[in-house]
Amino acid sequence: MSTKRYKIEYAKSSREDMKRTKKYILNTFKYREYGENFTKIMRQAADSLKVLPTGFDKIGLLYRGYDIYIKPYRTYLLFYIVNSETNTVIMLRVLKDGTDWEHIIRTWLKHEK
């Protein structure tokens, strides 16, 4: 029996989150190596969802009819949906833990409609 593998795609919002965080790291901490590697690290975390992406918790909110899942990774939270028909995971947001992520996601969803 072969394991189903999913393709990872990034919504514009998740790409903007990663870009904004990378810029923050570079400007605030002047930690060039971590800042330059931030996107790579987050993409590696997302790549782990290629197998069994539904193994993480749902947050109780929907995006375009799909359940939103949350994957904690280090000090970040990855929010994504799973389209089983196309075998695709779509990364929606990448947020720092400790933020009011529920408010951020709800506000973002209102603007996405």
Q: Can you name each region flagged by the protein language model?
A:
Residues 37-38, 55-58, 111-112:
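Juxtamembrane/interface motifs at transmembrane-helix termini
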Residues 22, 43-46, 95:
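Conserved protein kinase catalytic domain
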